[in-house]
């Protein structure tokens, strides 16, 4: 990071010198974080840059805090990249970028078009998909349609680079390669020495002057991204509305697949901090509503957010930075997670001091979604994290406890009346039966919990890539055995398993709890291997064509059977908290607490007893590349995942939220600030926070989670008085995109309506941001709505 600070200053200094020499030269720079460093460390240079910004020649683009990874962060993190970035651009630079500028991230999630449009963006630019190793993307100028149906104008530079030197070869390649020249003659060329190389040079600027209108060559000139997108919109949307190219779904990068796994501590730290921020911001908002003496720690929370957003940069969170950067990021996570726990405790104590009904719960979590109506956003003594208690914190009665039986042949049977698991002496689960319907989840001859090592020796891009042929080199860790069986505190039973091979030691706990339809796996891995990649097998006796993977604000389906080259290229894919497979009559899912990489493939083999069919899910746990950090992930790591039987979508979301919710030593239980009472469908209230403007209003983030229509009534805490609610943009203002569906089915989305009982209506995977304003009779509102929030 220290060198990045210097790179920013060198590049801006170089660019400003070029602007002094050439009155037509323009330059675009993204990332509010870069401008903030420059403002703090080089105020004279910053002042010179501001003048060029006012002239329209130095062009802030992107509107984000940094050019983040786009597959791994939560949807809320992507939103905060925008809100923090745009706030800085507005307040410090006096501009509002119109488009997302992400030339170098490793894939783009299917929620981006909706997030971008609901933030007010008009266009999206990247060139990274041109790096695909298997197929060529079909367009350069098109409308990208997200999982919810939102569309955003998108352009890929046909030069297939973000670091052109403006050579004639590059210009001719760009013209020849442009796939949409039947509709448009306009494209962008990103030039300059990139990745900290200093930007454009005099020679490059001179080439643009020389080749501006050269006969027989593409015409080239200085311009701005907004000018380019105005032309592209005119060409492919306004002039040819019936021929506008459209691409729907995620932009999967057929490369850099190992970034879903490299530097696991980056993934675990990010997931933990995101979940803890959700709980902490909620408790701080509640303390502000309930207690007029509470001072909302806005500045400190903003600082923690900015550090998290920086650590989501597209080489840090994916695990492809140098060792020093990852050491600093790990220290950031440790420090900020500890501070967030303290802030949450302070807010909880403030609530308890003024609310007689705020019962303090020990070792508790606030779960944002539960399948049981009325349980969400209420502190509950939690099984998540510690795995010591059941979800309600009550002792299980004897006849509902899990019974563990050790057989003469060494097998162990766990039975809780809902599930029966049979664990072989080698520690793999050879049978898992749903006792409600007799469904066997494990294919014949297979075992859940078998670990495999792949050779991690990619042709290039060591920490970035895992090759397809690495999957052919998989070797099982067969030195594995059951060590003992123990009882949990509240009626469950745990089988302890040990597995070892050269450089790898694995201690696993397999637990079946009372009254649960999930089999839990808690694994500690001592990882000393080099150039190896660790996966765990989870075979399912379910024949399915496609698997469902959670992503930001919804899920995506990817093929299990690889019929096309594009299908084959998706041999390692991103999943957030769950992956689910289903046939016509049954579904199962795997829910995780900190992993992102996975592969899903068909099981198809013939045995003497008959054909065996099913689906193999494998979670990617650890990798060990030598570059750029030769000690990647050396050390001890802990993982948690659950196999969910009879996995309806509400049940899977419930399990995913419980497993990932932040567990705190003490949390006050009180009526939620806001809650959704479902009418039909699956709608999730994902985040509750105070508005950024210090007004004291609440901001609610809701979305439809499973791809169907959903209706729910909003309920708000009585302390908010006769509160009103209206829909707002992601920027928390009233500027709504008229082309996107509204959250309320009964009228103008910008009109304030009574919050209590307001009916929400969302389309598949629709996201909505709601602003709840306290009534004059509400709790601690003092009329001017300041309430010590600053």
Annotate the PLM regions.
Residues 1, 150-355, 585-668:
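Catalytic grooves of carbohydrate-active enzymes
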Residues 1-80, 89-91, 251, 278-279:
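N-terminal catalytic cores of secreted or lumenal carbohydrate-active enzymes
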Residues 43-63, 113-137, 143-152:
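Acidic, His- and aromatic-enriched active-site or binding-groove loops in soluble protein domains
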Residues 70-88, 158-179, 469:
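Alpha-helical scaffold elements lining the catalytic groove of polysaccharide deacetylases
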Residues 78-111, 118, 174-188:
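CE4/NodB-like, metal-dependent polysaccharide N-deacetylase domain
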Residues 85, 100, 116, 224, ...:
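Conserved, mostly hydrophobic/aromatic
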Residues 93-138, 198-204:
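Catalytic domains of cell-wall/extracellular-matrix polysaccharide-remodeling enzymes
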Residues 112-117, 131, 140-141, 156, ...:
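C-terminal (or distal) subdomains of carbohydrate-active enzymes
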């Amino acid at each position: 990071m220290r060198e990045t600070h210097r790179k920013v200053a060198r590049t801006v200094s170089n660019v400003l010198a070029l602007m002094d020499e050439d009155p037509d030269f323009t330059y675009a720079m993204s990332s509010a974080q870069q401008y903030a460093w420059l403002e703090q460390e080089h105020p004279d240079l910053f002042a010179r840059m501001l003048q060029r910004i006012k002239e329209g020649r130095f062009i802030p683009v992107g509107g984000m805090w940094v050019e983040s990874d786009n597959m791994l962060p939560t949807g809320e993190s992507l939103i905060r990249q925008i809100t923090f970035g745009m706030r800085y651009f507005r307040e410090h630079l006096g501009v509002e970028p119109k488009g997302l500028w992400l030339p170098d991230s490793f894939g783009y999630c299917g929620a981006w078009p909706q997030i971008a449009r609901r933030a007010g963006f008009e266009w999206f630019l990247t060139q990274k998909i041109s790096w695909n190793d298997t197929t060529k993307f079909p367009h350069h100028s098109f409308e990208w349609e997200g999982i919810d149906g939102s569309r955003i104008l998108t352009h890929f530079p046909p030069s297939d680079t973000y670091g052109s030197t403006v050579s004639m070869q590059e210009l001719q390649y760009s013209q020849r390669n442009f796939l949409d020249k039947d509709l448009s003659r306009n494209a962008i060329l990103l030039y300059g020495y990139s990745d900290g190389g200093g930007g454009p040079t005099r020679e490059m600027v001179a080439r643009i002057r020389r080749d501006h209108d050269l006969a027989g060559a593409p015409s080239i000139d200085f311009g701005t991204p907004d000018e380019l997108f105005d032309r592209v919109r005119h060409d492919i949307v306004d002039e040819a509305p019936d021929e506008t190219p459209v691409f729907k779904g995620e932009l999967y990068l057929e490369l850099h697949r190992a970034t879903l796994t490299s530097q696991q501590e980056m993934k675990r730290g990010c997931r933990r901090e995101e979940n803890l921020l959700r709980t902490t911001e909620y408790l701080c908002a509640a303390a502000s509503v309930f207690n007029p003496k509470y001072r909302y720690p806005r500045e400190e929370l903003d600082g923690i957010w900015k550090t998290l957003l920086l650590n989501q940069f597209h080489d840090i969170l994916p695990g492809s930075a140098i060792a020093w950067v990852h050491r600093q990021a790990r220290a950031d996570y440790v420090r900020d997670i500890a501070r967030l726990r303290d802030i949450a405790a302070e807010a909880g104590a403030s609530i308890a001091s003024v609310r007689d009904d705020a019962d303090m719960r020990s070792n508790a979590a606030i779960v944002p979604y539960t399948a049981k109506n009325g349980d969400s956003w209420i502190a509950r003594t939690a099984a998540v994290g510690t795995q010591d208690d059941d979800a309600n914190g009550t002792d299980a009665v004897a006849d509902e406890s899990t019974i563990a039986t050790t057989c003469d042949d060494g097998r162990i049977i766990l039975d809780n009346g809902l599930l029966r698991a049979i664990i072989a002496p080698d520690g793999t689960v050879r049978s898992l039966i749903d006792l409600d319907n007799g469904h066997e989840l494990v294919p014949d001859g297979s075992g859940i919990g078998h670990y495999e090592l792949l050779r991690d020796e990619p042709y290039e891009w060591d920490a970035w890539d895992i090759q397809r042929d690495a999957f052919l080199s998989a070797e099982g860790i067969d030195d594995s055995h059951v060590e003992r069986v123990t009882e949990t505190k509240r009626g469950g039973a745990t089988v302890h398993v040990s597995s070892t091979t050269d450089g790898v030691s694995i201690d696993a706990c397999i637990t079946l709890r009372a009254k649960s339809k999930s089999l839990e796996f808690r694994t500690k891995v001592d990882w000393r291997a080099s150039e190896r990649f660790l996966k765990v097998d989870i075979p399912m006796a379910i024949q399915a064509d496609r698997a469902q993977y959670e992503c930001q604000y919804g899920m995506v389906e990817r093929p299990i059977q690889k019929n096309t080259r594009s299908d084959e290229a998706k041999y390692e894919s991103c999943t957030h908290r769950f992956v689910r497979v289903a046939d016509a009559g049954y579904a199962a899912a795997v829910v995780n607490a900190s992993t992102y990489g996975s592969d899903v493939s068909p099981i198809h083999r013939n045995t003497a007893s008959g054909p065996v069919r099913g689906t193999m899910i494998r979670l990617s746990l650890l990798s060990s590349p030598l570059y750029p950090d030769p000690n990647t992930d050396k050390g001890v790591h802990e993982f948690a995942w659950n196999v969910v039987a009879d996995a309806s979508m509400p049940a899977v979301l419930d399990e995913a939220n419980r497993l990932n919710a932040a567990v705190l030593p003490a949390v006050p239980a009180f009526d939620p600030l806001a809650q959704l009472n479902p009418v039909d469908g699956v709608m999730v209230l994902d985040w509750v926070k105070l508005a950024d403007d210090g007004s004291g209003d609440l901001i609610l983030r809701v979305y439809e989670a499973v791809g169907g229509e959903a209706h729910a009534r909003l309920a708000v805490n009585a302390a908010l008085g006769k509160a009103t609610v209206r829909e707002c943009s992601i920027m928390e203002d009233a500027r709504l995109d008229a082309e996107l569906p509204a959250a309320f089915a009964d009228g103008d989305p910008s009109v304030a309506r009574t919050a209590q009982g307001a009916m929400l209506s969302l389309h598949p995977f629709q996201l909505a941001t709601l602003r709840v304003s306290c009534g004059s009779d509400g709790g601690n509102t003092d009329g001017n709505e300041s309430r010590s929030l600053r």
